[in-house]
């Protein structure tokens, strides 16, 4: 289900949310409450650090999180138990589910200085290179932004040693386009409202 109208803001500018009327918010919150009521999804606080720490210490059987946490989890667990990964679950039975990418944005601001502009562009090219992206993925779990990174030795070696990294990549490629996420210019304000009201 879409988060906002107009094809999740991809066919035209989003003008209204849909999650409050299409059942997706209610389904998600109902499922989440059922897990909490059953005692299998405790409230470990705001943010993800406490949940990740509990999982890494063997205090919980599973955790939901960003792929960006995977390397840290594997490091923290340090072989004390097997860390498995799976596709992100769907809420509604029969729903294929999917994932979207986000975070780790790279921005370059116009300063009017041509030398800085040229240096910034060289730095951006370095960061988005297949070699840098393969290393970044292996060290963090973040998705490489280019599939050319998959051809790099560091990427292949990491997948061979930690096949858990492949799960998120596979699910991203298996996700339908509507899971790419909503384009909504007021997302920062909307998040703040959800968090505070």
Regions found by a protein language model. Name each.
Residues 25-32, 51, 69, 116-120, ...:
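Stable alpha-helical elements in mature extracytoplasmic
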Residues 52-54, 70-76:
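Pocket-flanking alpha-helical
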Residues 6-45:
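Glycine-centered hinge/linker elements that transmit conformational signals in sensory
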Residues 1-13, 29, 100-110, 190-197:
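Periplasmic solute-binding protein
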Residues 43-57:
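Short helix-initiation/N-cap motifs at beta->coil->alpha
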Residues 61-66, 84:
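Paired acidic/hydrophobic, glycine-rich loop segments that form the ligand-binding mouth/hinge
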